[in-house]
Amino acid sequence: MKAVILAAGEGKRLRPFTETMPKVMLSVGNKPILEHIFDSLKNTGIGEVIIVVGYKKEVIMEYFKNYKKIKISYVTQDKQLGTAHALLQAKNHVKSPFVVIPGDNIIDKKSIANLIQDKSEYSMLIKEHSHPSKYGVVFLEKGKLRRIVEKPSEDIGKFISTGIYKFPKKIFNDIEKISKSGTHSLSSVVETLVQHGKTINTIKADQWMDIVYPWDILDVNEAMINNVSSVKSGTIEKQVTIKGNVSIGKDTKIYSGCYIVGPVSIGEGCEIGPNACIFPSTTIGDNSVIHPFTEVKNSVIMKNTRIGSNSFISNSIVAKGTIIGNHFSSTEGENVVEIEDEFKKLKNLGAMIGEDCTIGSHVIVDPGIIIGRKCDISPIKHIIKNVSSGSKVM
């Protein structure tokens, strides 16, 4: 069986992290979201994957090429006109029943296998959710889909659509007919099929998450490393304390006096310490340096970063290539975060810092602040509002 992965979107609400890459390539658990999907597809009967690419497609194509034993074909959605239109681009690559997966989803292997093994012609994965109004809410009748209500104004129902389906080849004809009325999303196509009497079976997913906003990266990252294996490939000096499951990549050096509590994933070629503290739910990307007496907890530190000594980083995201001076502090707490003209009230959120920034010593960043890509912040500054990409704070 083949799988079609929809990976053409940018993810505007994830800026600045998607300014140089599609959202499916964001790093969680020290690997791209899309790679986690491939891991879930292994040994499920999927032998070929068609990836629908678009925004910054070269980033995906260069990274994956052919992934291990799974053959990959690429088709391009030149204009992002919705998920139904994206799937339509794969029409000439599919001749039998196939699986559709949004590229920004995290889904477990067992759920994919259950979907593949289902005997129904049309099937979909659903998930119970505590805040269903953020998604398409599904209503069922004896396990079959009755209707989908997209992002209702209040929480109704308890199950949502994951956007993961098994379709027959004729879904492409369905899309072409239905899209003439102006429908461009797969959920709307599925809703129309149900209205016209089509039976769509539902299967409850076990583990499923998606990434919509920058802070979702932290939640998904935590889930991805929760069961990280203890692997210590690097060099660990004496008087280092390691508790719980901690993965340390090759050529990484953990200097004396460091205190690390898992789950933690540290990439290859890193330098940690001396006397640094790394606390649970933290990932540190390849070739990064955490200088002495710095504390990092529940954060995503992407590759090629440098964090100065005596710094404190909590509930934060630091994108690749960023250099942070000594005595930096990302304060955590409650704040209202503005994303693409949306305002979200959040608790216990630190800083969200784009790639290739240079931040001087003795800088404090208020909770929930977003610092864009390629920003230059002078020493001894207190950042109390968002900083646009390319800005200088003098």
Task: Please provide the spans of the model-predicted regions.
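Short N-terminal binding/cap micro-motifs at the start of the first secondary-structure element
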Residues: G11-P16, S133
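Conserved donor-nucleotide/metal-binding helix-loop-beta segment in metal-dependent transferases, i.e.
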Residues: K110-Y135
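Catalytic-core segments of class I nucleotidyltransferases/pyrophosphorylases
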Residues: I116, E141-N226
